[in-house]
């Protein structure tokens, strides 16, 4: 927890915690499970809600090519130190190691029948053409990869309100369409 800047302000809190292995609190001191999931997405002109259950995520109808793009984007734009490990017998979710947001995205990619480990093997970080790391001002990050057909593709992840303002086209069920700032 210290590594993630989760510091106790009162000594008596530390003494009370004792030998706990994981305790996560938000700003209003509510205990959480230290696990994040994707709960809604907007893909192919459709808003999918309540997909935190992997069985629900499977119900999402997305064209195969679009799924591949989503899974590839998640795979190359998540830190390679973030991983999903098999859950223990008494746990229902995969064990998330590393950044919880990235793990939740990786879990979503997995629910879309994507194999982020395989993609990470095909695109090792050392072979990225360029990476613009996450920036709190721009609220996004981008990774450029050289694809197998020698083309270069840029993948971006970040705050939707920032990214959508920069989009000139959007991929929907019927392919690419042009959009304006307010009509994406």
Which residues make up each language-model segment?
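Conserved cytosolic headpiece of P-type ATPases
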Residues: 1-184
